[in-house]
Amino acid sequence: MTVAVRRQSRHCSAGSNSAQPNNSHEAISRMDVLSERIRDFHYNEDQTHAQLNRKLQLRDQLYYAISPIFPMCGLYIVGSSLNGFGTKRSDLDLCLMITNRDIDQRTDAVVVLSSVMRTLESNQIVAEQNLILAKVPILRIKFIGTFHDITVDLNVNNSVAIRNTHLMCYYSSFDWRVRPLVMVVKEWAKRHGINDSACSSFTSYSLVLMVIHYLQCGAQPPVLPNLQQMYPKRFSVRADVRTLNVSLPFEPIPTAMGWQFKDDATLSELLLGFLRYYAFQFDFDADAISIRMGKKVNRAQVAQNQSLPFQDIKKAFVDSYREFFSQEAITKNEFNFLYKLGVVNY
């Protein structure tokens, strides 16, 4: 699997979504300001090529340190560093593949990570290691010297993470608006206290899926298609993860899919449509998201982790959506709204 990030985006997408601003000139101006702020925020926070190259160098050094004990292994970058949603502050997630078969994450993965931990104890660039026992155990590694600002989370044989990274990379590159929208939604969720897996709220990956689902099913017309349905061979679960390549361009879209590109909706319209969709149209008690199926599914049909009370999660969407359209103290509300989204600072 190549580790080069696809930077070319398709400038194609959907028309106006369900969030309809007031028709006044003042409301339209506010929408323009918000779109510009979102673009600036993404530009300032987006992971740079230089940062990615440093992560690639660190990955290579770790591979050369680990490969003597696992000669046939592969070491893959996964997560936000590669899928297009990385920021300047993103950690480096790595997946060590030692076999094509699944392993027991509760026992075998811990044994492998313990071996890696012992091997890296004498490595000159390693400052600290911590083995974290979870559903998918990880070895957290901190460094000194050149890579002191990068933290690595290493897992073993979590092939799902490689497949998800491959899929998310193509979604993030399909339309230029996807990345800035995801970035500002993550920051908004963090400011509202609902982007912290340690507190049983949304993980960053869950928020990415929520944005993609909205762009597939909530925006009218849709901004994103169902890529797994459109390109079943490319995203087949049977594909060998070692052959996945995030730099290959898409084949022409099959005419049978009937997909049409539109580029009418602004970032602000899509953001407010996202808030409106989860505030008023998505039932957190009954609905779940399926990116693979490209639709909402019954929540009872899928396993769900315990999360914050649904009314607390829903309240953040409702409050943010209503605040933007409040007619009282428009200038103050606009500034507060942008601040809570994370696109301005006091």
Language-model region placement:
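N-terminal regions immediately upstream of nucleotidyltransferase
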Residues: M1-R89, N100-V111, Q129
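Pol beta-like nucleotidyltransferase catalytic core
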Residues: M31, R37-F41, H213-Y346
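Surface-exposed beta-strand-to-loop junctions
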Residues: D32-D46, G74, R89-N100, V156-H166, ...
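Generic preference for well-ordered alpha-helical elements
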Residues: S35, L52-R59, Y63, D91, ...
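Residues that form ligand- and interface-recognition hot spots within folded domains
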Residues: L62, I66, F70, G74-L82, ...
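Short amphipathic alpha-helical segments embedded in low-complexity Lys/Glu-rich regions
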Residues: L75-F85, V112, Q129-I138, A198-S206, ...
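Conserved catalytic core of two-metal-ion nucleotidyltransferases
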Residues: V110-I162, P180, K190-R191, N195-A198
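Basic, alpha-helical interaction scaffolds
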Residues: R163-T203
